[in-house]
């Protein structure tokens, strides 16, 4: 199955913390890099057979990746991925920003042109990609 989701990263399940409705899954990326945290339904965990040590693909829509120009503290967002901007494609309303992180991987973020200009995001800039755990999907 082909997907339109730009951010697709392979890893192994490091931990599964079950809840009544939602389950928190920590994914360790193949080849190293930061762990990703996903909050998915308990039903999805059962249906996909997600277990510690099992292979999964982390899926994140580019529109769900926010950017910060400095480390962020005092925030509930679990996935804070430091990286370096490798490319910026700016349009009239939105911009696509590619961020290199951990072992040659990239995340793609789509932000408003206004945010791009306010933050001064440009190629070579250090940024932190921010993704809520509830915005991370998993595939097996």
Task: Identify what each model region corresponds to.
Residues 2-17, 21, 34-35, 42-95, ...:
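Glycine/charge-rich catalytic "coupling/switch" loops of P-loop NTPases
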């Amino acid at each position: 199955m082909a997907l339109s989701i730009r951010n697709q990263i392979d890893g192994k399940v490091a931990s599964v913390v079950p809840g009544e409705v939602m389950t928190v899954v920590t994914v360790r990326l193949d080849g190293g890099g930061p762990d990703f945290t996903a909050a998915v339904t308990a039903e999805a965990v059962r249906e996909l057979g997600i277990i510690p040590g099992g292979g999964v693909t982390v899926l994140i829509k580019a529109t769900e990746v926010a950017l910060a120009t400095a480390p962020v503290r005092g925030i509930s967002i679990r996935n804070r991925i430091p990286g370096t901007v490798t490319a910026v494609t700016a349009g009239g309303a939105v911009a696509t920003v590619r961020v290199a992180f951990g072992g040659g991987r990239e995340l793609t973020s789509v932000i408003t042109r206004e945010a791009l200009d306010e933050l001064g995001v440009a190629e070579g800039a250090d940024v932190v990609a921010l993704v809520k755990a509830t915005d991370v999907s998993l595939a097996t």
